[in-house]
Amino acid sequence: MKNSRQYSENVHKLYRRLKSEYAKPQKVQYNDILQAMVYAIISEHNTIDQTECAFRRLSEYFVDFNELRLSQTDEIAEVLGQDTALAPDIASRLTAALGSVFNMYNTVSLETLRTIGKRQAKQVLAKVEAVSDFVVDYCMLTSLAGHAIPLTAKTTEYLKKEALVHPQADQQEIQGFLTRQIPAKDAYQFYALLRAHTEPDKSSMLKKKTVRKPKTTKRAKT
């Protein structure tokens, strides 16, 4: 990436600022890779609050991911709710991705990926139908202990607008650049803080300021 030294300094400045402004995010770790995939497909075009609500509705309505795979997209979109952005598109992507997984393994599970190397696991995830780079990176980061920083369209736009990466850099270039700047142990924190910073309502994620009460001078007894 051109001017990588300057961009590197800018990224580290941003990271320090985000850590000072926001509460430390709790690291998310999925025991089920498929759960991470479904969550990521919803999350890519929705806020965290919208995603949490939509994912909870899916979990409560459908018995398991196999039932979700076999359901009609209209029904899934209705369950996702009107407050979920791009619900019909997400519903189609969910059934396509789950169907692709079933065709690959004859079961609705990706747990076999834990038995192979991370590079190979990432290649397999990238072959799943209707799965984007964001979804692949989110799965690697939160369920396979991979070194990745998932990027939504909104976070990518922010990085370019704020001169944190080259304006002509593509998604893969940005991803590679960021993982060279942010070590694996900090990858989730950086992703979560950057995501929080680009949310429309981030007030709940800001650090709570401690209000100091003015000291009172005790009056001497007379």
Regions found by a protein language model. Give the residues of each.
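Alpha-helical ds-nucleic-acid-binding substructure associated with the helix-hairpin-helix region
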Residues: 11-15, 55-129
